[in-house]
Amino acid sequence: MRCLALDIGGTKIAAAIVKNGEIEQRQQIHTPRENVVEGMHQALGKLLADYEGQFDYVAVASTGIINNGILSALNPKNLGGLAEFPLKASIAKHTDKPIGLLNDAQAATYAEYQLQNSEQVSNFVFITVSTGVGGGIVLNQILQTGSRGIAGHIGHTLADPNGAICGCGRRGCVEAIASGRAIEAVSSQWEEPCDPKEVFERFRKNDEKATALVERSAKAIANLIADLVISLDIQKIAIGGSVGLAEGYLSLVEKYLQDFPSIYCCEIETAKFGQDAGLIGAAYWVKDVLLDKPEGTIYG
């Protein structure tokens, strides 16, 4: 089966045909920034038209929460006016093929899980530490999406009850402490302001302030991992994202995990899929759902 996969992010929309895990005819456009609702309708219509007659189903990975085909977000700023956007209905105007939708981090999780031996690893988590902190959870070999599409929003678990207010409105979320956005919120106030990329450059040069800031992030992720392991019996975790894959970051996380009793720890690895994890994961997931549900029931 040939899939038209879409990956909708805050700044870009990627599209490609996915067949047998291989990407073909990939293209990328900017996410609309003005007249965003109408702009998104038009962008989706154009992408569907570009691939007309070349696919058997549509799989969409999107930032935010997918619930009954509607796109929303815990942090409305991430969608820039697309809150409560009828994503599935918008796509359905342009195709009669089956459509499946899920969160982009959930999709990336499913892609990463395809690389695991499911007989040995039945409980798996993917964590992305990037502009925000997100993830996905596989339990008993099944990706958890939840009844409202919010399963895996692990960046909005508690890290510090006295911490900064998160974009979701709660105080002290992991995302408000560990993310690239949280790092920049601090580093932009320094006497010599810098972005997260430069923070890590200074960290690797043993700059005291940069090191403290990166360590704060890594500690929050280490504690998140410990919470996930002890609450869900997670066997392996993959870490990705621009912060998560930054040189020296994963070793810091592992260092802090060593301070915990061993029952709180599991095997940690770097994520293997890059920018196309959402496309591939969404294509795999929707195909598996279609195969498991012959009547054509599609989640999202």
UniProtKB/Swiss-Prot annotation:
The metabolic or biological pathway listed in the UniProt record of this protein is: Amino-sugar metabolism; N-acetylneuraminate degradation; D-fructose 6-phosphate from N-acetylneuraminate: step 2/5
| Broad EC category | transferase
User: What's any GO biological process attached to this entry?
Assistant: N-acetylneuraminate catabolic process
User: Where along this sequence does the record place binding of Zn(2+)?
Assistant: 156, 166, 168, 173
Q: What is its EC number?
A: 2.7.1.60
Q: Which UniProt keywords apply?
A: ATP-binding, Carbohydrate metabolism, Kinase, Metal-binding, Nucleotide-binding, Transferase, Zinc
- Record-annotated residues binding ATP? 5-12, 132-139
Recorded catalytic activity of this chain's protein: an N-acyl-D-mannosamine + ATP = an N-acyl-D-mannosamine 6-phosphate + ADP + H(+)
Q: Name one GO molecular function term.
A: N-acylmannosamine kinase activity
What the protein does?
A: Catalyzes the phosphorylation of N-acetylmannosamine (ManNAc) to ManNAc-6-P.
**How does the record describe its quaternary structure?**
Homodimer.
**Which family does the similarity line name?**
Belongs to the ROK (NagC/XylR) family. NanK subfamily.
Q: What is the name attached to this protein's record?
A: N-acetylmannosamine kinase
Q: Which organism is it from?
A: Haemophilus influenzae (strain ATCC 51907 / DSM 11121 / KW20 / Rd)
List the gene name: nanK
